[in-house]
Amino acid sequence: MLIEIPNVFSKQEVSHLREQLDARRWIDGNQTSGAMATTRKRNQQLDKDDPVAVALGQQIMDRLLAHPQFVSAALPLQFYPPLFNRYQGGETFGYHIDNAIRSTPDGMIRTDLSATLFLSEPESYQGGELVIQDTYGQQSIKLSAGSLVLYPSSSLHQVTPVLSGERTAAFMWLQSMVRDEGQRRLLFQLDQSIQTLTAQQAAEQELFNLTGIYHNLLRRWSEL
């Protein structure tokens, strides 16, 4: 399941984020690469321990945990703290699959979902599409600044070469309360239907029944 979430951050907020990011020292992006990815990856990143990157990453996590659509789709249990990368001058990241397990200060997490928060407007750079191969075929993603795409970490994906301009983004992984992608999709669809029916002031008893089904399925499928 691939979900695009628009306007997680406003244009003004993105501008403020970029001012802080652009002033930092960027390093070789292979810091977070697995052994197979190092030959395919050419980009720049902020060091994961950079204090500004850590603070902005926390700001992003706080925003996402307060975003109803993100929480509904991801059912987040634990984040790998957001990192920041940029591509320019032909830099690219060829097709790869993200590592299944990552280490955090609090222990190990299973990477169920990956997310990219775009911090450059699409017209400001040429190339740089996030191309994802999923069960519905190939999808090419290039969102407006402040918007986010969420997709299974098991997906084969790449960032195409940035031929001009600069593509800056935040990226992150998370472990979901529900490991199985199909189960997460069903829960998301059910929750979205409940929210739609609630807005339409549907019959209270039917909403009560559907909400009960949702929580009983979540209880059955979740791993905490």
From Swiss-Prot:
One of its GO terms (biological process) is DNA damage response. Coiled coil: none annotated. InterPro entries: Oxoglu/Fe-dep_dioxygenase_dom, PKHD_C, PKHD_hydroxylase, Pro_4_hyd_alph, Pro_4_hyd_alph_FE2OG_OXY. 2-oxoglutarate binds at R167. Fe cation binds at H96, D98, H157. Keywords: Dioxygenase, Iron, Metal-binding, Oxidoreductase, Vitamin C. Gene3D superfamilies: q2cbj1_9rhob like domain (2.60.120.620), Rabenosyn, Rab binding domain (4.10.860.20). It comes from the Bacteria. Residues 78-176 form the Fe2OG dioxygenase domain. Its EC number is 1.14.11.-. Its cofactor is Fe(2+); L-ascorbate. PANTHER family: PKHD-TYPE HYDROXYLASE YBIX. This is PKHD-type hydroxylase Shew185_0721. It comes from Shewanella baltica (strain OS185). The lineage of its organism: Bacteria, Pseudomonadati, Pseudomonadota, Gammaproteobacteria, Alteromonadales.
